């Protein structure tokens, strides 16, 4: 007797790996609720800055500096600002690691499941092009609709006294390396992934982007009004980052795009001195 061979249907070649995975299944390892994720991100954002501020203030306390001396050191010292940034990013990742461990999860569930591939830098560059074009168009439209919008308002990124190789290197790490990694893991990996588990892509992306952009509203000089131009900028950036996270299932392309964006700002502000 001869056995009947089962007919094997070939997989369609025009499908990408992520097309074979439903969005809900991409984020099935995230067992906590979207509401819990939003609350945790907001608390973590505030708490890490408080903890970093306390820790960085230990050095002036040992030096027996006055409040004015401490404030001057924190505002003008590149080393102090670098140390503060390192503490904030470390506390953020540490807090997120604690949360994931309590829920029997890990960073792989947030999109860190493989090494970057050659396609990722291309997606990053393409994403930057999309972000830049949309940003220019939207700013033109918003300037026409809202004439009072201050498109020239500057964001205070710190490190104003950075000169020389060592100081510029610390500034580069603080602005171009650390925030893209930490913010993508927290915002697009954790927050967007948590929201996407229950919500459609557009709703999850808009909510994530609104929360992310709100953190940049108060980034101006002390006493300056809210930075609505920075809100628009980072909101558009986040939408593109969420799209990359959705389509690739991972964070590498988004991290690359975020680094390109911050890298352009670094070159403009600290090397070309364009304000």
Predicted stretch roles:
Residues 102-122, 190-208:
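Cytoplasmic juxtamembrane regions at transmembrane-helix boundaries
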Residues 36, 40, 115-131, 179, ...:
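Alpha-helical transmembrane segments of multi-pass membrane proteins
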Residues 46, 132-136, 140, 144-145, ...:
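Transmembrane helix-loop-helix hairpins at the membrane interface
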């Amino acid at each position: 007797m001869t056995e009947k061979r089962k007919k094997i249907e070939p997989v369609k070649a025009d499908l990408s790996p992520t097309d074979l995975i439903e969005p809900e299944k991409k984020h099935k390892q995230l067992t906590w609720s979207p509401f819990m994720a939003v609350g945790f991100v907001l608390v973590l954002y505030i708490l890490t800055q408080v903890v970093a501020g306390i820790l960085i203030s230990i050095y002036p306390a040992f030096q027996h500096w006055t409040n004015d001396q401490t404030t001057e050191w924190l505002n003008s010292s590149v080393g102090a600002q670098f140390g503060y940034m390192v503490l904030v990013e470390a506390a953020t990742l540490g807090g997120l690691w604690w949360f994931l461990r309590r829920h029997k999860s890990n960073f792989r569930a947030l999109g860190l499941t493989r090494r970057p591939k050659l396609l990722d830098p291309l997606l990053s560059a393409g994403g930057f092009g999309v972000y830049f074009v949309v940003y220019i168009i939207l700013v033109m439209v918003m300037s026409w609709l809202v004439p009072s919008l201050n498109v020239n308002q500057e964001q205070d990124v710190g490190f104003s006294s950075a000169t020389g190789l060592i100081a510029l290197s610390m500034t580069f790490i603080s602005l171009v390396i650390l925030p893209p990694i930490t913010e993508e893991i927290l915002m697009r990996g954790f927050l967007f992934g948590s929201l996407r588990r229950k919500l459609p892509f557009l709703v999850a992306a808009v909510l994530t982007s609104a929360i992310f952009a709100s953190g940049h509203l108060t980034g101006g000089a002390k006493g300056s009004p809210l930075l609505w131009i920075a809100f628009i900028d980072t909101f558009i950036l986040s939408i593109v980052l969420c799209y990359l996270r959705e389509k690739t299932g991972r964070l590498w392309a988004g991290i690359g795009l975020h680094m390109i964006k911050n890298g352009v700002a670094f070159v403009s502000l600290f090397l070309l001195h364009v304000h």
